Amino acid sequence: MDENNHGVSSSSLPPFLTKTYEMVDDSSSDSIVSWSQSNKSFIVWNPPEFSRDLLPRFFKHNNFSSFIRQLNTYGFRKADPEQWEFANDDFVRGQPHLMKNIHRRKPVHSHSLPNLQAQLNPLTDSERVRMNNQIERLTKEKEGLLEELHKQDEEREVFEMQVKELKERLQHMEKRQKTMVSFVSQVLEKPGLALNLSPCVPETNERKRRFPRIEFFPDEPMLEENKTCVVVREEGSTSPSSHTREHQVEQLESSIAIWENLVSDSCESMLQSRSMMTLDVDESSTFPESPPLSCIQLSVDSRLKSPPSPRIIDMNCEPDGSKEQNTVAAPPPPPVAGANDGFWQQFFSENPGSTEQREVQLERKDDKDKAGVRTEKCWWNSRNVNAITEQLGHLTSSERS
């Protein structure tokens, strides 16, 4: 459609110029469009009728603005600003052959400006290399940004999954909490159930009493060592029954303390009497003195090794013959005046300490059975004490007779 050759014939004119010339030169439409008085321009007198009647007939559209843009493309200009008058130096009445000099202008777009500038100002080699490096750098930055964007999208998806999971767990916890609250409310509604919800203080809520482990009778049952009795007092209770129980516990504790003092005093007096009697016996005998035992060892060892019948002691039993061979024969004691000379002679000659002390010395060699050693010693001391008591009873009865 464009004509760039100046030597073309009139038959090769653009259709827009040919149709425009015919439309303006038609005398039947002079009331709408016509030539000016100078015959070098044309005037559109009635644009609405021009758009409604003439444009559809010649150009197959009714847009007056589009017609004006096409005139500007072919070099037409507005001759009078107060009316629609357009002119071109080669568009003259009666001279259609001049229109061959009218050429359509190429539209200038924004993206074509760099190409024009490049044609006008060619780049040097250094500038071209610099531009290429910049293009490569920008391309790499674009790729890095795209990768980072992809990672951000993946992290966002992971976060969304975690948030969804946390919401589900929260809903589950709320459901469990509601279930527990409903269960507790149902339990509290039951008759005969009372719960003390007052805060408890650990220091005053429970008190431990450690009872002594001293036992003075070998026939009592064995108890665990260091056994403690815990007396729990409820701070929040204010009923009379709780005060009564506390009072009874205090009375029991005071009575236990009294009995403990009484037993300890009796134990000390018995040990003192036994030590005095042992000294009298040891002065007249040639056997080595056995180490004294405390009251605690006596009670504990007597329970660890209790004989089948601790209350029955055979004072007339004869010592083992094999052990008597190893012992040194003691000289006979001097005769004692009185009716019970035979008794004293038998008592001092049949002292069981010689055999029992040897057993104790043999058992001390075993380091793995220390409890057994204490049991044998305590058993001998308990037998010795019981024997002395019974012999004293025989002595008093014989003297009376």
UniProtKB/Swiss-Prot annotation:
Instruction: List where Basic and acidic residues composition bias occurs.
Output: 356-373
SUPFAM superfamilies according to UniProt? Apolipoprotein A-I, Winged helix' DNA-binding domain
What is this protein's function per UniProt? Transcriptional activator that specifically binds DNA sequence 5'-AGAAnnTTCT-3' known as heat shock promoter elements (HSE).
Q: What is this protein called?
A: Heat stress transcription factor A-4a
Residues forming the motif Nuclear export signal are 388-395
Q: Which residues cross the membrane?
A: none
Q: Name one GO cellular component term.
A: nucleus
Where is the motif named AHA2 mapped on this chain?
341-350
Assign the protein's first listed, main location to one coarse class. Answer: cytoplasm
Self-association state and partner proteins as the record states: Homotrimer.
Instruction: Report keywords, A-Z.
Output: Activator, Cytoplasm, DNA-binding, Nucleus, Phosphoprotein, Repeat, Stress response, Transcription, Transcription regulation
Record's comment describing the protein's domains: The hydrophobic-rich region (HR-A/B) corresponds to the oligomerization domain. AHA motifs are transcriptional activator elements.
Task: From the UniProt entry, list the residue stretches annotated as the region Hydrophobic repeat HR-A/B.
Answer: 122-188
- Identify the residue span(s) of motif Nuclear localization signal: 207-213
Q: Which residues bind DNA?
A: 13-107
Which BP terms does GO give this entry? Answer: positive regulation of DNA-templated transcription; regulation of DNA-templated transcription; response to reactive oxygen species
What family, per the record? Belongs to the HSF family. Class A subfamily.
